[in-house]
């Protein structure tokens, strides 16, 4: 049987001090420091439960640890102990419930001595009970009894840790609806039980704080924001309120679940996560300043002043459910006011105001409030079961039926809710067999249909629970009482004690070193060193350096010779090397240690380490590199980089894991200045005189790229730095392409085996976080500082798969990587748009999408209703017309006629033309949707179609031909162009008669169809040409050879080669206003190019998307992007941006779901982007909000 208490944990000030900003050591009494895990019962290796999460210390003391001159003072409320719950969410979405008591406790004497603190100094400490069971009350009551017992003047009859151990080890989880467990903490009797499984889920909290902090309208507004999955930030000056309100609202949305990021109490230094674009519910203390954050689109709920603010309107719950919900809540909260005009004891007034409502708030009120919200869901989703066929819910049909019954158009709130992850998750659970028997929503719908009371669906308690008593251990009678002046530490092992001494000795030594070598000597005081000549001082320093290096050499060799039963991390050798590196202000220890490794490698050592040695060496190198980087000692950093690439261990699959891969958290690798210095160092090394300069530069840059990949630097950031260095060396585009290919190749090899690096975790420390003083099997070799653990945990929540969502927060933290300086600031990062509609109708993958523009239908005054339509084609052989102006009923018509996959679509004022794998081109009447003509003549699948003026159609196919058709006669007028292979892309200028086509033969062909002659064959690409764009005399082509090329149409010459993508260039666009070029590749990268001193230069890189760029559409002020990972983005160029292509600024991005997209089309006039997925679903994003 499981236990209700999994761990008892103590967090506070550890022997290694770090500020919340990551600075090592003591930095004053007014500074906040990172909390550490001090004690834990039971040890992880003795527990059946997973270890407490590493972010626990950061989360239970969210502000950090502060020093105080006194402990509890009755006249100072700020010194009072605080009791509050927190909830942590793991990567799989499961919750960990923690009860905390934070208080001021005396700092240990050895820490005071090591850091020279004032005597009787106090610091923040927190004791916690950790459980996966949501029993908030028993967790809090038990913890408070422990705390009172510790500081009681009467003391306890047993040592405090014995009481804790017995309680944690012996109190079982009660059987739901059957048991009540009784146990005692000293002389206090406590109990715990759980509701039946067929009842509402256990909510061991009171909902009263929620209804006390928010009035009815704000409560409903918060409830609605949760249902439509907005970004929600809850503020309060009390930790408890943040957790209680968050948990309460999660219970009120039953039977649905909040599947987005959930952090009821965010640690203070994580405030920057509020700007994340992913939906979240987070709580933040009111003292934390958010004025420098964009906060655009965030729903801010201020519990202290009963206020909700947001820059984006929250849709209202539809009627009549909104009025019913509001009245029911008012009736519960204010029964006397609601029923003041009713005659008591007459008619139904007694039923309307139950007697229990006149009592103080209790569990009955909690239950009734939850049922009120369940009734709201039952009404809104009335009859939803009738629209589930073959395990698929028909949203459109349900909305149409509801619109007919309410005589209202589809409500925006309901449309958004039915497309939410919460609703989709509920449907999946509902369709599983284990969910149907306990589905209270459907039980309530059935009960209401029979005219029964809503409370009748809840199980009746027919019997008293069985009492299970946990007997106290027998204690020999003794007059001894255990009293404490501070919360006691558990007993440390010899190994833990030794680790603690090493950390404190290193800290003390660093202070002494700083004391012996002050920045400047006091005036008038001559030291011994002042009497040395410069030569004597140099000789003395040289002797000191030599002495340290000799000691390090011996320590290093002894560290490698430790026996298999000896732990290097707890050895004297490791501790001494660490102290020499950490306490040496001049860097002699760090550089000397790296030199020892280098000499050992030169002597013939192969660099292979055991698992334990690998951990020790890795952490020592981290410390050495971090210290060297802080001193700008780039030569030591360079040497460490090189030796780390030589030392390795073998993993379980006999694959080498190099030390270098584990140094990624050090910030120096992000700095261009380091890599430029390293490249210059490599260029200074001896080289074969017969090698030309370009080849030498390329070889040296390959070495740089190898180290970048070995570290795990993100591909885009690594390439930006390599490209910058290469451009300064004037490398040609062919060598640039080779370099790009090499970097991508080694990156793919690394990611293929090790996975993507968590590069964006905050690098708080450059070295090993020293072992915890009482590290009861909780410290392992990968332990991070608690702040880094906290940030890593938050990032893992943003990046985890949540109901098919795959959204990497690392891309949120840095949307744009610009090789100059990014102009997309936090303020310019516009809000995530939630207005995304899901359009269903196709039975196969969507393979073609077309946007009907005003120019296409000659809409000069805005009276054409078809301007703004989207037209889609699919593998189901159907063409569908969608009207975005009809919310909930977007499907306008379905065109049937093709027998193969639809590959291309175009239209004009009156007609639609589509091309298919069935070798045919069909022309449809746009108004009547009737099939007008079927044009046959191609010998292979049709890949491109284009409507022209004068009832003409231009088509291209995989047979290599381009044909002109006259729709009126159903005849092919002429084959206007021929290529040697399949045509994949087509452009035509109707005003000049110039036609351009390209495809698999790697040649771009240009014809003048009016003269019937071919003008040019543009050769240069080495692989398929995927996309072309022609504007006036400029032709742009994008190819699978990773380049785009710019050509002159009149001269037939290549004006520029646009290289540096890491994959096929699948989309190209010309921005006519600024005469810039935009390219998108399979690497997910957008590159903006503009003319610069007679050439074309890349001026901006955008890393917002993580998969192939499928569509780029540039207008005068708007730019729409769509990618294969179902992500979209809209850019805006302000009128004052000038004529530079770099003036494009990210306007907003929509929420993204995990789906593979085949095609994208955008309507910039209405700021809409539509994507077609492999699952047959279209996602229509409407970003129409005034600027």
Swiss-Prot record:
Compositionally biased spans, kind Basic and acidic residues: 526-536
Highest taxon in the source lineage: Eukaryota
Topology term for the membrane: Peripheral membrane protein
Residue stretches making up the dDENN domain: 332-437
Phenotype of the disrupted gene, per the record: Defects in seedling development, root elongation, leaf expansion, flower morphogenesis and fertility due to defective cytokinesis in epidermal cells.
cDENN domain span: 199-330
Gene Ontology cellular-component terms listed: clathrin-coated vesicle; Cul4-RING E3 ubiquitin ligase complex; plasma membrane
Cited PROSITE patterns: DENN (PS50211), WD_REPEATS_1 (PS00678), WD_REPEATS_2 (PS50082), WD_REPEATS_REGION (PS50294)
Example of a GO biological process term: negative regulation of innate immune response
Compartments in which it is found: Cell membrane; Cytoplasmic vesicle, Clathrin-coated vesicle
Annotated Gene3D superfamilies: 3.30.450.200, 3.40.50.11500, YVTN repeat-like/Quinoprotein amine dehydrogenase
SMART domains reported for this sequence: dDENN (SM00801), DENN (SM00799), uDENN (SM00800), WD40 (SM00320)
This protein's UniProt keywords: Cell cycle, Cell division, Cell membrane, Cytoplasmic vesicle, Growth regulation, Membrane, Repeat, WD repeat
Tissue spec. comment: Expressed in roots, rosette and cauline leaves, buds and flowers.
Region (Disordered): 508-536, 765-793
Domain uDENN stretches: 19-179
WD repeat positions: 841-892, 897-934, 937-975, 978-1017, 1020-1057, 1060-1099, 1104-1141, 1152-1187
InterPro entries linked: cDENN_dom, dDENN_dom, DENN_C, DENN_Domain_GEFs, G-protein_beta_WD-40_rep, Tripartite_DENN, uDENN_dom, WD40/YVTN_repeat-like_dom_sf
Biased composition (Polar residues): 779-793
Summary of the function given for this chain in its UniProt record: Involved in growth and development through its role in cytokinesis and polarized cell expansion. Required for plasma membrane internalization. May function in clathrin-mediated membrane trafficking, including plasma membrane endocytosis, essential to both cytokinesis and cell expansion. Acts as a negative regulator of basal resistance against bacteria.
Subunit structure: Interacts with FLS2.
Name of the molecule in the record: DENN domain and WD repeat-containing protein SCD1
Gene (name only): SCD1
């Amino acid at each position: 049987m499981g236990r209700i208490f999994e761990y008892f944990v103590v967090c506070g000030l550890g022997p290694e001090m770090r500020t919340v900003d990551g600075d090592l050591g003591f930095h004053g009494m007014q500074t906040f420091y990172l909390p550490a895990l001090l004690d834990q019962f039971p040890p992880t290796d003795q527990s059946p439960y997973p270890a407490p999460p590493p972010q626990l210390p950061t989360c239970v003391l969210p502000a950090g640890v502060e020093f105080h001159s006194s402990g509890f003072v009755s006249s100072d409320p700020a010194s009072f102990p605080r009791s509050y719950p927190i909830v942590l969410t793991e990567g799989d979405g499961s919750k960990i419930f923690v009860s905390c008591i934070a208080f001021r406790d005396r700092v240990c004497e050895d820490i005071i001595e090591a850091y020279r603190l004032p005597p009787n100094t106090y610091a923040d400490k927190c004791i916690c009970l950790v459980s996966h069971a949501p029993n908030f009350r028993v967790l809090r009551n038990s913890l408070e009894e422990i705390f009172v017992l510790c500081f009681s003047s009467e003391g306890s009859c047993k040592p405090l840790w014995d009481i804790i151990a017995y309680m944690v080890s012996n109190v079982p989880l009660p059987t739901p609806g059957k048991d009540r467990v009784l146990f005692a903490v000293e002389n206090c009797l406590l109990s715990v039980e759980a509701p039946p499984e067929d009842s509402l889920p256990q909510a061991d909290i009171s909902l009263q704080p929620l209804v006390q902090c928010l009035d009815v309208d704000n409560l409903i507004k918060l409830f609605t924001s949760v249902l439509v999955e907005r970004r929600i930030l809850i503020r309060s000056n009390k930790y408890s309120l943040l957790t209680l309100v968050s948990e309460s609202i999660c219970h009120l949305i039953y039977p649905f679940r909040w599947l987005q990021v959930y952090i009821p109490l965010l640690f203070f230094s994580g405030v920057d996560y509020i700007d994340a674009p992913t939906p979240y519910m987070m709580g933040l203390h009111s003292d934390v300043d958010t004025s420098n954050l964009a906060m655009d689109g965030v729903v801010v709920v201020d519990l202290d002043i009963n206020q909700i603010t947001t820059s984006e309107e929250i849709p209202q719950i539809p009627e009549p459910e909104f009025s019913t919900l509001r009245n029911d809540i008012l009736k519960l909260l204010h029964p006397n006011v609601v029923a003041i005009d009713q005659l008591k004891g007459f008619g139904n007034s007694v039923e309307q105001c139950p007697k229990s409502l006149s009592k103080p708030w209790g569990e009955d009120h909690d239950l009734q409030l939850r049922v009120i919200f369940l009734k709201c869901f039952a009404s809104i989703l009335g009859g939803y079961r009738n629209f589930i066929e073959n395990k698929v819910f028909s949203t459109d049909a349900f909305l149409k039926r509801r619109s007919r019954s309410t005589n209202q158009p589809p409500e925006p709130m309901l449309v958004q809710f039915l497309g939410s992850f919460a609703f989709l998750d509920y449907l999946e659970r509902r369709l599983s067999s284990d969910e149907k028997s306990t589905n209270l929503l459907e039980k309530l719908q059935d009960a209401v249909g029979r005219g029964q009371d809503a409370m009748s669906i809840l199980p009746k308690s027919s019997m008293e629970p069985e009492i299970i008593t946990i007997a106290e251990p027998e204690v020999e009678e003794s007059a001894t009482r255990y009293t404490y002046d501070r919360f006691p530490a558990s007993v440390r092992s010899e190994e833990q004690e030794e680790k603690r001494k090493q950390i404190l000795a290193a800290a003390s030594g660093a202070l002494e070193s700083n004391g012996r070598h002050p920045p400047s000597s006091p005036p008038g005081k001559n030291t011994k060193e002042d009497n040395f000549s410069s030569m004597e001082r140099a000789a003395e320093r040289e002797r000191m350096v030599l002495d340290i290096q000799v000691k390090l050499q011996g320590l290093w060799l002894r560290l490698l010779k430790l026996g298999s039963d000896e732990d290097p991390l707890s050895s004297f050798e490791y501790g001494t090397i660490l102290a020499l590196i950490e306490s040496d202000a001049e860097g002699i220890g760090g550089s000397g240690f790296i030199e020892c490794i280098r000499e050992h490698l030169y002597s013939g050592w192969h660099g292979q380490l055991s698992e334990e040695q690998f951990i020790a060496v890795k952490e020592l190198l981290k410390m050495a590199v971090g210290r060297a980087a802080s001193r700008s000692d780039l030569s030591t950093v360079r040497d460490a980089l090189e030796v780390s690439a030589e030392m390795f261990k073998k993993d379980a699959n006999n694959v080498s894991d190099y030390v270098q891969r584990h140094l990624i958290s050090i910030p120096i690798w992000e700095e261009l200045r380091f890599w430029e210095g390293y490249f210059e160092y490599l260029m200074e090394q001896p080289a074969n005189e017969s090698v030309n300069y370009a080849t030498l530069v390329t070889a040296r840059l390959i070495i740089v790229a190898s180290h970048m990949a070995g570290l795990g630097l993100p591909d885009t950031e690594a390439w930006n730095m390599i490209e910058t260095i290469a451009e300064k060396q004037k490398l040609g585009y062919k060598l640039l392409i080779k370099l790009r290919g090499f970097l991508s190749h080694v990156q793919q090899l690394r990611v293929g085996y090790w996975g993507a690096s968590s590069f964006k975790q905050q690098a708080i420390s450059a070295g090993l976080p020293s072992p915890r003083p009482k590290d009861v099997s909780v410290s392992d070799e990968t332990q991070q500082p608690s702040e880094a653990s906290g940030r890593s945990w938050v990032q893992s929540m943003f990046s985890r798969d949540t109901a098919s969502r795959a959204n990497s927060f690392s891309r949120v933290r840095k949307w744009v990587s610009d090789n100059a300086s990014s102009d997309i600031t936090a303020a310019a990062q516009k809000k995530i748009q939630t207005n995304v509609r899901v359009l269903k109708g196709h039975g196969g993958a969507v393979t073609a999408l077309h946007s009907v523009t005003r120019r296409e239908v000659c809409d000069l005054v805005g009276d054409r209703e078809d301007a703004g339509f989207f037209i889609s084609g699919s593998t189901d052989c159907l063409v569908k017309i969608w009207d975005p102006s009809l919310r909930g009923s977007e499907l306008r018509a379905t065109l049937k006629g093709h027998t193969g996959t639809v590959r291309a679509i175009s239209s004009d004022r009156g007609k639609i033309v589509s091309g298919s794998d069935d070798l045919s081109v069909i022309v449809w009447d746009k108004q009547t949707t009737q099939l007008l003509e079927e044009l046959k003549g191609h010998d292979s699948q049709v890949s491109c179609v284009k409507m022209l003026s004068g009832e003409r159609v231009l088509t291209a196919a995989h047979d290599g031909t381009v044909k002109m058709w006259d729709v009126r006669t159903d005849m092919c007028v002429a084959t206007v162009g021929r290529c040697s292979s399949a045509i994949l892309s087509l452009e035509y200028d109707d005003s000049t008669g110039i036609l351009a086509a390209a495809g698999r033969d790697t040649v771009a062909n240009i014809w003048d169809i009016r003269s019937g002659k071919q003008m040019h064959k543009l050769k240069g690409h080495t692989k398929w040409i995927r996309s072309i764009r022609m504007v006036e005399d400029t032709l742009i082509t994008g190819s699978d050879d990773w380049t785009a090329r710019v050509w002159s149409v009149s001269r037939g010459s290549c004006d520029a080669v646009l290289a540096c993508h890491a994959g096929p260039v699948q989309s190209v666009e010309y921005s006519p206003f600024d005469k810039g070029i935009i390219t998108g590749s399979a690497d997910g990268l957008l590159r903006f190019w503009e003319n610069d001193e007679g050439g074309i230069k890349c001026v901006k890189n955008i890393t917002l998307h993580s998969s192939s760029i499928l569509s780029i559409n540039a207008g005068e002020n708007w730019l729409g992007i769509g990618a294969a990972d179902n992500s979209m983005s809209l850019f805006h160029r302000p009128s004052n941006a000038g004529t530079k292509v770099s003036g494009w600024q990210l306007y907003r991005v929509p929420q993204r779901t995990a789906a593979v997209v085949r095609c994208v089309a955008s309507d910039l006039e209405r700021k809409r982007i539509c994507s077609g997925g492999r699952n047959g679903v279209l996602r229509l994003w409407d970003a129409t909000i005034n600027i």
